Amino acid sequence: MTLAVVTERTTGTEPNHMVEFREGLELLKNEYPDKAVLKLRQAFESDKRNPYYISFLGLSMARAEQNWEQALDLCETAVQLKRKEIKFHLNLIEVYALAGWREKALRKLDNASKLFGDDARLKRFRAKVVERRAPRSAFLWTQAFLKSRTRQIAAPPVEARRQMKS
């Protein structure tokens, strides 16, 4: 779907900030976070207390600018404003995952599971967070293994160390 089609669909009787928000969501969905940030920021500037604008602006900033601190602040604010909206929790969890804070993302998933029960979206997010984590732990295991082998090869025998001390 092109931006022209999205603009055509959303213009009409809706206020401009709602049009900007819908276009921003469409851009975010279609993997254009840089463009989405601009649209979502315009919507946010029109209504700074709208938790939907706040949450999705935070998510788009995380994806486009890797501005983790501000993205987390926005997403956490949206969750505080409307705690019962699962999408705000999912956006916050995604920002934690994008920032590389897997443990925090998993804790937030656990908390959201307590609040929303057995939701399929939470299960999908958990699978993504755990999946992203696997290569990292494999890398760390390999790194630790190589480091221990290097020490064994480089370290002088015990007898030689004793002689060096004397």
Annotate each language-model stretch with its function.
Residues N30-K39, A64-T77, A99-N111, R136-W141:
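Structural signature of tandem alpha-helical TPR/SEL1-like repeats
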Residues T2-V19, R136:
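TPR-adjacent "capping" and linker segments in tetratricopeptide-repeat scaffold/adaptor proteins
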Residues T13-S46:
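Alpha-helical segment of the N-proximal tetratricopeptide repeat
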Residues F56-L57, N91, F125:
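Canonical tetratricopeptide repeat
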Residues T11, Q42-E45, E76-Q80, D110-K114:
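Conserved structural position within tetratricopeptide repeats
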